[in-house]
């Protein structure tokens, strides 16, 4: 990860993952750690080409005594990035509250959603990376998970109507993110609790760090497994929907042997996404998807 080439490759990869729309406002959750600092900088790097705006959203939970340092590095990043891109910083202070991780996460997402609503953003990007994915899948395995747990962290999910969470760094190693921060002189804060192995995720992280030298492709392998599990989970309901559609078309048309899989699959995807309109089924036959009144 030396020199300009790895930096440029990372910028191109993240820009492709983000796929910023022209004029879009993207909220980036920035805790102040190296991963989210890098994501904020990478998003700002991609923004001008799409005439997009980036909002660096920082949530101060009021739990950690040195939380002011996290906020300071986020504000400093926003100031630096605003010189070359349309970037602003939004800070929310929630504390003091419960140190329970689930409650902190819920409060953080609620604050991020509020910022998205205020700024007109439809997407919130978080800095979950490849090692986060590995830890999540392994924790799920230790709990005796099924296919849902094996799917790990989703690259995208709906947080609320009209607002989606996106994770453009899920295939990126955090060492590359730290190298990016160093190459561009972006300061970041470190959370001392990340080395407390009394916490389950930290214990799993320490375990994985011990075996990575023997399994150098570990994170890529787990990422592939998670992707396969997600595909299988999503494919099953769609397969059932395709079967129902073929049965219904058979009832209506009498014969469906000349209706291609691709036509039925496209119709199934349209129904899943709630897209209305006409869909070609076969010569002289169209299926019309309409919005049903409640």
Language-model region placement:
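AMP-forming adenylation/ATP pyrophosphatase catalytic core
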Residues: 2-35, 47, 52-55, 61, ...
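Surface-exposed beta-strand edges and their flanking turn/coil or helix-capping segments
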Residues: 69, 180, 203-204, 279-282
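Residues that recognize and position ribonucleotide moieties
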Residues: 105, 170, 197, 279-280
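Acidic, metal-coordinating catalytic cores used for nucleic-acid/nucleotide bond scission
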Residues: 63-68, 195-198, 275
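Flexible helical/loop "lid" subdomain adjacent to adenine-nucleotide binding pockets
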Residues: 123, 129-272
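Generic macromolecular interface patches on structured domains
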Residues: 49, 53, 84, 110, ...
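ATP-dependent adenylation/nucleotidyltransferase module used to activate substrates
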Residues: 1-140, 175-176
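Short, solvent-exposed polar/charged micro-motifs at secondary-structure junctions
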Residues: 98-103, 200-202, 289-291
């Amino acid at each position: 990860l030396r020199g300009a080439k790895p930096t440029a490759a990372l910028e191109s990869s993240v820009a492709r993952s983000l796929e910023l729309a022209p004029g879009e406002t993207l909220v980036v959750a920035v805790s102040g750690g190296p991963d989210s600092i890098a994501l904020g900088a990478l998003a700002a790097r991609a923004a001008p080409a799409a005439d997009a705006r980036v909002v660096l959203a920082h949530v101060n939970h009021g739990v950690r005594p040195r939380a002011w340092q996290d906020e300071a590095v986020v504000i400093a990043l926003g100031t630096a990035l605003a010189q070359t891109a349309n970037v602003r910083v939004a800070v929310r202070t929630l504390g003091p509250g419960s140190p329970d991780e689930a409650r902190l996460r819920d409060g953080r997402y609620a604050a991020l959603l509020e910022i998205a609503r205020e700024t007109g953003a439809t997407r919130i990007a978080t800095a979950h990376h490849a090692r986060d994915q590995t830890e999540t899948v392994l924790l799920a395995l230790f709990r005796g998970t099924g296919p849902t747990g094996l799917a790990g962290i989703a690259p995208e999910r709906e947080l609320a109507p009209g607002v989606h969470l996106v994770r453009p760094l899920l295939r990126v190693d955090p060492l590359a993110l730290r190298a990016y921060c160093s190459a561009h002189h972006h300061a970041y804060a470190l959370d001392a609790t990340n080395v407390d192995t009394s916490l389950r995720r930290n214990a799993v992280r320490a375990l994985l760090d011990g075996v990575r030298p023997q399994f150098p492709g570990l994170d890529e392998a787990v990422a592939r497994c998670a992707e396969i599990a997600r595909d299988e989970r999503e494919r099953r309901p769609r397969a059932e929907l395709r079967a129902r559609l073929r049965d219904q078309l058979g009832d209506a048309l009498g014969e469906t042997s000349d209706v291609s899989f691709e036509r039925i699959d496209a119709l199934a995807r349209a129904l899943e996404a709630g897209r209305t309109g006409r869909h070609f089924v076969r010569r002289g036959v169209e299926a019309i998807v309409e919005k049903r009144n409640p």
